[in-house]
Swiss-Prot record:
Keyword Cell membrane assigned: no
Region (AIR carboxylase catalytic subunit): 387-557
EC number annotated for this UniProt entry: 4.1.1.21
Keyword list, A-Z: ATP-binding, Chloroplast, Decarboxylase, Lyase, Nucleotide-binding, Plastid, Purine biosynthesis, Transit peptide
Annotated pathway: Purine metabolism; IMP biosynthesis via de novo pathway; 5-amino-1-(5-phospho-D-ribosyl)imidazole-4-carboxylate from 5-amino-1-(5-phospho-D-ribosyl)imidazole (carboxylase route): step 1/1
Record InterPro entries: Ade2_fungi/plant (IPR016301), ATP-grasp (IPR011761), ATP-grasp_carboxylate-amine (IPR003135), ATP_grasp_subdomain_1 (IPR013815), PreATP-grasp_dom_sf (IPR016185), PurE_ClassI (IPR033747), PurE_dom (IPR000031), PurK (IPR005875)
PROSITE patterns per record: ATP_GRASP
Family annotation (Gene3D superfamilies): 3.40.50.1970, 3.40.50.20, ATP-grasp fold, A domain (3.30.1490.20), ATP-grasp fold, B domain (3.30.470.20)
Residue stretches making up the ATP-grasp domain: 108-293
GO cellular component: chloroplast
Organism: Vigna aconitifolia (Moth bean)
Protein's UniProt name: Phosphoribosylaminoimidazole carboxylase, chloroplastic
Record has Transit peptide as a keyword: yes
Subcellular location: Plastid, Chloroplast
Amino acid sequence: GLYEVVVGVLGGGQLGRMMCQAASQMAIKVMVLDPQENCPASSLSYHHMVGSFDESTKVEEFAKRCGVLTVEIEHVDVDTLEKLEKQGVDCQPKASTVRIIQDKYQQKVALLPAWIPLPEFMKIDDLKAKKWDSLDIHFMIKSRRLAYDGRGNFVAKSEEELSSAVDALGGFDRGLYAEKWAPFVKELAVIVARGRDNSISCYPVVELFTGHICHIVKSPANVNWKTRELAIEVAFNAVKSLEVPGVFAVELFLTKEGEILLNEVAPRPHNSGHHTIESCHTSQFEQHLPAVVGLPLGDPSMKTPAAIMYNILGEEEGEHGFQLAHQLMKRAMTIPGASVHWYDKPEMRKQRKMCHITIVGSSLSSIESNLAILLEGKGLHDKTAVCSTLLGFIMGSDSDLPVMKSAAEMMEMFGVPHEVRIVSAHRTPELMFCYASSAHERGYQVIIAGAGGAAHLPGMVASLTPLPVVGVPVRASTLDGLDSLLSIVQMPRGVPVATVAVNNATNAGLLAVRMLGVANDNLLSRMSQYQEDQKEAVLREGDKLEKHGWESYLKNS
């Protein structure tokens, strides 16, 4: 195989299962230690040892058969890992790192020297009011250990709620800490891989939509580039400070002021990275195994423009719960770009993660539409359909519409949903600014802008959006459209506008379809057919001319 030493994984849940799937593709042998005989990873692993990953004797016995020991869950027996490391066992991540991350309070203390932005927090062991002054009234009471999927957290919005929060979490003896409420507007996450050579690779920033349990993940996150860069910087520095190889999930808060705050770190593959199996050149599981054994890291970039991951959670107990989950899986099979990952858990419980569905597509808006169709229970059988608005048409005045309608007709012919609006660069500059600067966030991929006379609209829009802009010079009442053409085509370096001929909105539409076709095989196929139809039309005209002669041809044309 690629790597002869056996990798041992403490835990055989769905993360262990997907590690085994990735390992089989790379010819890496993976053993799992899990107490459940028919755990999700059991049937796919090189070997499954039945036993608890927090039982010292079992972990020691397991480690004897492994060259590298890693985890799919951080709640393991760290004392045993430290003992094994002293005996020469290669544990990745290191026991010291797992110990820090197990305790969410110590995790934040450890990150402070690296200047990682964090919500205000403090250790608590009683209800003395003076200790709470720095955190104001609105705060989170959190369990330091064994807290995940929203468990172990309690919001306290008043002093009266504080006592209830402590009681709900099992009292101070369990180990609690307080964190000032972070008024976030989005929850983000970054999967970060670190190799044994200290190389670090970051996956694209994703957006989480949760009800405590991670439920929906969108990639890339619908945030501006500055926010993405800041999120990646925080995640990179957090993992760099931990100084151990492997894949880490860094969960973040985005505040209304645009600040990024670190929520927590997991030292393993994570639910927020499941989409990478279909959406990225190297999945988080294909990344974790090479990282811990010392092989090169892969490419974390996306190979599809957008992806969304949806967790199927148990809705009911027992057989009925399985039936409901299977119905949703069957519907997913009718959705273009959808992939189903069943975890093969033997028992159905409410709110238990049983499966995830990943949908990839040409834009976030298109995959959001497909997810809505899935959740509404409607099968999508026309797999050639484009599901959402991909293109925006704007013009400076309704007098431009007779010209611009030709581009709209092209969109209708190719089946590309589009939005047509009047936006004037001179009379509605605020509207133009909002439209152009947010177009990519609304899922648009191309903008066609038509203007006559001064014709500043296409260029101004191009200066405000990262999307490609196609400019249509509209013939005005003077100068026969030459003024419009020169205004649009003479853009300064760094602000490109793809400009077509005067009044040739048809070509603008066709060019936009070709741009969209780069990431849409259906549109690319339709464009190829359009070109073939054009060729056939010219050949028919040529045959007709040769057959009837030019005089007859002109009379009948």
